[in-house]
Amino acid sequence: IIVTEPSLWGIHDMQRVVELANHFNVPALVCVNKFDLNPNLTADIETFAREEGLTCLGRIPFDPAFTEAMVQGQTIFESNSNSRAGPAIKHIWQRLSFQLAL
């Protein structure tokens, strides 16, 4: 799973990982973290993924609750059951499970 963020560095790093995965013939999936910080670059990431034949599992919104959870040494689900990111992560997990036939 390639988790990227909508920034120039995020796109660059994602492209490098995709190139590496292609070189070694390793399947890859994409997930966009903090997608709502830059909708235009998020669209560019998703377009690139489609052009490369990659599945985009989903988008995770920016959520300050993540930092709070890390400080507490907990998952986002343990720390804040009403977080904005929680439903997105569950959706991505469901799609990943389907992709891997779990």
Residue ranges and their predicted role:
Residues L20-L102:
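C-terminal lobe/tail of nucleotide-utilizing enzymes
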Residues W9-D13:
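Short glycine/serine/threonine-rich phosphate/pyrophosphate-binding segments
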Residues Q15-V18:
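Histidine-anchored nucleotide/phosphate-binding helix
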Residues I1-L8:
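Inter-motif core of Ras-like GTPase G domains
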